[in-house]
């Protein structure tokens, strides 16, 4: 992940962009199949979480073939992007500071770490992004607020707090780019579709609490 991200910054070739998308398909697929279906099989509603991350993997697979996300650099949010990039490494440090050890501690390839890294990556290259991926990940981040109190996981407060401004910036960019299209039927239908997706994902994730 670090090597591919560095390659996107230094030499954003077509190969580098496709490799990052393949990596995202693998990473989200691993969370869906290995982490939730196998490792967390005893947890209630684990199948919903597996489907959730499986859908994100499919969205990246679709992006791989269509080239929808061009990974074009947007340098406006360097500070926030840097914070989001650091989060996956702060997660295990905070778990370790609380006296936890593997497998109880949060690692860099667990769902919350992957979510915050992906949000940071897409914010850094936010000229045009797959908004469905953003919606899914932002729902996950907001659910993290409740996990802080329900499951006593203070690490998730990092994810939730850092992604709130990212959510605002993503949708600010989206509406700025599409403001001139608001009278077109296609744009309005897409807005309603995104709202519907938000509601459905929110309901499904709330069932896992």
Outline where the language-model segments fall.
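N-terminal topogenic module of multi-pass integral membrane proteins
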Residues: 1-41, 205, 209
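Membrane-helix boundary connector in multi-pass membrane proteins
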Residues: 38-42, 123-133, 142-155, 173-185
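Membrane-proximal helix-loop-helix units in multi-pass membrane proteins
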Residues: 43-120
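Loop-to-transmembrane alpha-helix initiation sites
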Residues: 45-50, 149-165
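Final/C-terminal transmembrane alpha-helix of multipass membrane proteins
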Residues: 190-208
